[in-house]
Amino acid sequence: MAGAASPCANGCGPSAPSDAEVVHLCRSLEVGTVMTLFYSKKSQRPERKTFQVKLETRQITWSRGADKIEGAIDIREIKEIRPGKTSRDFDRYQEDPAFRPDQSHCFVILYGMEFRLKTLSLQATSEDEVNMWIRGLTWLMEDTLQAATPLQIERWLRKQFYSVDRNREDRISAKDLKNMLSQVNYRVPNMRFLRERLTDLEQRTSDITYGQFAQLYRSLMYSAQKTMDLPFLEASALRAGERPELCRVSLPEFQQFLLEYQGELWAVDRLQVQEFMLSFLRDPLREIEEPYFFLDEFVTFLFSKENSIWNSQLDEVCPDTMNNPLSHYWISSSHNTYLTGDQFSSESSLEAYARCLRMGCRCIELDCWDGPDGMPVIYHGHTLTTKIKFSDVLHTIKEHAFVASEYPVILSIEDHCSIAQQRNMAQYFKKVLGDTLLTKPVDIAADGLPSPNQLKRKILIKHKKLAEGSAYEEVPTSVMYSENDISNSIKNGILYLEDPVNHEWYPHYFVLTSSKIYYSEETSSDQGNEDEEEPKEASGSTELHSNEKWFHGKLGAGRDGRHIAERLLTEYCIETGAPDGSFLVRESETFVGDYTLSFWRNGKVQHCRIHSRQDAGTPKFFLTDNLVFDSLYDLITHYQQVPLRCNEFEMRLSEPVPQTNAHESKEWYHASLTRAQAEHMLMRVPRDGAFLVRKRNEPNSYAISFRAEGKIKHCRVQQEGQTVMLGNSEFDSLVDLISYYEKHPLYRKMKLRYPINEEALEKIGTAEPDYGALYEGRNPGFYVEANPMPTFKCAVKALFDYKAQREDELTFTKSAIIQNVEKQEGGWWRGDYGGKKQLWFPSNYVEEMVSPAALEPEREHLDENSPLGDLLRGVLDVPACQIAVRPEGKNNRLFVFSISMASVAHWSLDVAADSQEELQDWVKKIREVAQTADARLTEGKMMERRKKIALELSELVVYCRPVPFDEEKIGTERACYRDMSSFPETKAEKYVNKAKGKKFLQYNRLQLSRIYPKGQRLDSSNYDPLPMWICGSQLVALNFQTPDKPMQMNQALFLAGGHCGYVLQPSVMRDEAFDPFDKSSLRGLEPCAICIEVLGARHLPKNGRGIVCPFVEIEVAGAEYDSIKQKTEFVVDNGLNPVWPAKPFHFQISNPEFAFLRFVVYEEDMFSDQNFLAQATFPVKGLKTGYRAVPLKNNYSEGLELASLLVKIDVFPAKQENGDLSPFGGASLRERSCDASGPLFHGRAREGSFEARYQQPFEDFRISQEHLADHFDGRDRRTPRRTRVNGDNRL
């Protein structure tokens, strides 16, 4: 995600060491030193550990002793090394005299593959030791990233092997190998498959050495991918069945490949080709005049970064392109730069500023509020986000501003401070930033903004500016007051709502405005604490064993238990190839209170008694009298690390044998329940997360039936020998599977929460089943389609008595309140009354009223009407609310108050706080708002109009002077290049469209504009930046901490120039005739056509526990008329080396200067949902052609280790010699693509919401699903569904 910034904090770094010093440094780091580790967890005190560098794997490891590694980080993940105590890990111990290390003895390693980096905070024994580590690691970081791909593969292989071979015995078992391959996304169908491959490698023993493992890897990769459509190999007659190491690609053949297939002009020089091959291979035995590739090495080259699709020459900044005015550039810009997560409870962090600046961001935001001691603080105002000091932020900016780029940085000041604190801000700007702060114009006589070259290493202030001659005065603000901005809220924070099913209290985010209370869906109560989750202390240490997979309880009476144990161990070890030492523990059949250890050795099962005794009232456990343990768990853990010793053998306990039938005693398991019965049970629990597991009729088969998104769904679970399979995820047992999905989502965001059986139904079940939940229920093929139409739920009050005429109608009296009403066409509605659920009643017998159900409004209105945006669950009108404190509390919560509404009888919302003080503050403020709601709203609107500015701060504003946007000034003499305007995305959408896009582009040619996410994006999600970019907006500010598609597009835009943060807009955008939404206005720009074939992939990341089933989506994103998507088929169960059949995908691009080629790898899960795996996005103008590797990145745009696609790509002019469009252009292209590749999405639906893309194809697909679902529903449902139209019954 970050650009190529220097690893040292100040950007300079130590001078490069000599070759001799490198050897000395590497040897010293490999030996290691003892240093003190300062933890990020408050519960852990600093500890002394041995730190070493493992050169074979390029990792830093630490341990207490010599034989057990406690932790490791990959050097390739290190982003920065800072000298001194420059992390919060040191701050936690400032008051502890035992841990006050000398500043010069400390350093911090920042590493990770996400926006928020992790820290390794260390205290060495001397300053020389610190320098040794910093110099050595700085060299290793660069050397590791620049290493040739074969060397990177070698290091990766050793890392995988050593992760299993922890004792460094240079051998692992076949079972370990099978598990390892599963971890790297390769399915081994059975042990026989491995034994056959190992036989090919002349493997004769039960263990595998590293050399054999490496050879197996080469064999697996080549054998799977030699079938790819590579004409060069076919032409070279290298496709025969010989082993790849016996086939060679000579230097002349490789040179021919580079020239003819890759179009590499430099390859005409034979010496350059020779040098390239030698640097790639790094093999002393092939440092000869004519080096060569073995065939599998050549295929590895095709997938390598050395064969990238991106033209790396564009990574360099071209100074000649940096002489235009700032308004001609796209400038990398951050919104809410200080945040590390969401906008209501995450942490404000100095590290976020450092991270953004080192990623090349050139416009950052400072949200300033009055703080203590006369100095402002920075945070997201009136929220739970933490606060940081303004002065600390300035020091961080100074330190990191020009590490990644020397081009100017713009500080966008969101100022909420008093005049006094504004003056202090101005003073600190000058004091801290010094000469880098721009305080006067570059050229007074200029008629436009200065260029990036003119502003090198300068920091500009964006802030409102006073009129000439004012000491301070009020100026108009361009930001309208809005109740929906969380910064304008009266109070907000975490409160708790009771779950009506399990009566647990769950956190929700509440916002009190001048007229309403908004509350979110269930959220996390963690308020952005940087600390890692503290480990939970186990209660009852003597019972720790009960949840371990090796504990089987009582297996049988008498000798039955012994026989059952022997059978379990024998079946498990023979089937899985488990090693000696595999074991289980069971209750003793003959000695009450004792246990029996049964284990596998030399093909037989042996048994050992575990004795127990009481010692001072507490139990003790032992095998021999001289070594006693406090718990059975401690005893087993000990012998997993220390060998069992007796006269005949010495052996560690190795692999626990899982329980096979433990699920039968669980409350969620049903041995004899049909699908229909399961559905009927779940229909009575209208809560997502309700679930049960049932045995299916097919052998070794189960089903999880659950509720999600209001619907009942099912998924199959298959028992395959000793393994339980859910989709392609493997578990040791059904209990392990359920336990895993109680902690992780099973379907979208749904976790298994409420186990359902008859006892649970009696407590929480409704009287009437929810038949609506059976939409999709009868068709196992449709698991994921949501409700076909959103329904508006309300409450109604009866105007007359009504007596039901049929069984599916309600009976009610005048003034009855009918809840949860769904309005239907034809004069008949459905609702809940008198214990009856969703029965029919005539709509002309009732009048609508406010109801609790109506508090959850339709999604279309959420973004516009709520400060919580998509997180909104409910809203209450404060003047209509009545507040009552519950002194007695409720259900284990002491601090509870109730909110009721006079218009809704017998309804209240119980809300819990964490403390009495918090409860009283909420109650007080809600009551105050209820009395003064109208006055508060009027006051807020009055305050919006004027803002006081200190002269000292105003004088620091030179070029970026925010003013209200005035469309009438565009193109006139009144337009001033020093003025700029800011727009929330919703306002910007009014200008970046076909009607006004050309006019807005005219504005941006002279002046700057900044666009930022709307305030309702509390989850810090981002908007689509493409329409803003093509209309010339320079400062399109995004949440850098959010790993979504807009940020990935942003990273792609600034690829050119090596993430320097400035990209010159195409010259066509400075053509006054150019219209961003009209391709006929493209003058002097040649359209192009692209043809792509996806051939294969390597080292795709895993998503969860299963082996992925990947497919690739290829997208051209850019101008509205160019946008189009296509996708491959999916490959079953292979993420290590999948291959796709040759199929060309064609794209025609009218505006290649503003077009991106985007690859996204998804996996298709068991619900036919697509889950993100990896992506790569490039500007089209920087693509190379031929057989090219596409290096893949994660969602944070960080490079994934060795992950890549192999594609064949051709780019050619879209116009033929006679001037006509090529056969791959225009409508014919789209038609051909539809015929060739199945699902195709094209043309952005930019009318209305900018995020409502490609909706028509999805809508068509949804309708076809509904039709098919209705077919199954009508075929399988016993009772026909009836609707009413105009009073008539319809079947």
Curated annotation (Swiss-Prot):
Q: What class of enzyme is it?
A: hydrolase
Question: Can you give the residue ranges of the PI-PLC X-box domain?
Answer: 320-464
Q: Where is the SH3 domain?
A: 791-851
Mention any Pfam family matching this sequence.
EF_HAND_2_PLCG
PTM-bearing positions, type Phosphotyrosine? 506, 771, 775, 783, 977, 1254
List the PANTHER family.
Answer: 1-PHOSPHATIDYLINOSITOL 4,5-BISPHOSPHATE PHOSPHODIESTERASE GAMMA-1 (PTHR10336:SF173), PHOSPHOINOSITIDE-SPECIFIC PHOSPHOLIPASE C FAMILY PROTEIN (PTHR10336)
User: What protein does this entry describe?
Assistant: 1-phosphatidylinositol 4,5-bisphosphate phosphodiesterase gamma-1
The species this protein belongs to is: Bos taurus
